[in-house]
Amino acid sequence: MKKLFILLALAAPLAYAGELSCKQGATTNEGITDHWHCTYQGRDLDAAYQAMRQQDLYGIEALPAKLTRRNSTRKWQDSSACDDDGNRDRTVTTIRRTSNSLTVEHLFLGACFNPTDAKIHLQRQGGKILIHYQHSAS
């Protein structure tokens, strides 16, 4: 009986896990910006975000695995210079939350590599969450 309770306790979060369905939107900016539109059946923004991170979408691995509970901006530079002039690659990750939305943007400002931008916006609407993911590279 004890094993059954443990099994039920472990499986309970899965009962509330939502279903994610995605379709690719138009590629814009001469093919360097990809758009994906997804719908997550559920109301948990963090669960929808984690479901999106599990998708095999180009650039999504750049988004942070863990989210802060509050709005935040994190900036950092690579510790070593990438050219003879001392330039360093810079990265900016921004998380913005409201009660019904979540936006995460990861901007790589390459000094020696091409800049990239990955952005995901989740909007709670009724019993589902509408998601727009965009990745740009130049």
Regions found by a protein language model. Give the residues of each.
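Exposed acidic/polar residues on beta-strands and adjacent loops within beta-sheet cores, strongest
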Residues: 17-138
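Basic side chains
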Residues: 2-3, 124
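Sec-dependent N-terminal signal peptides
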Residues: 3-13
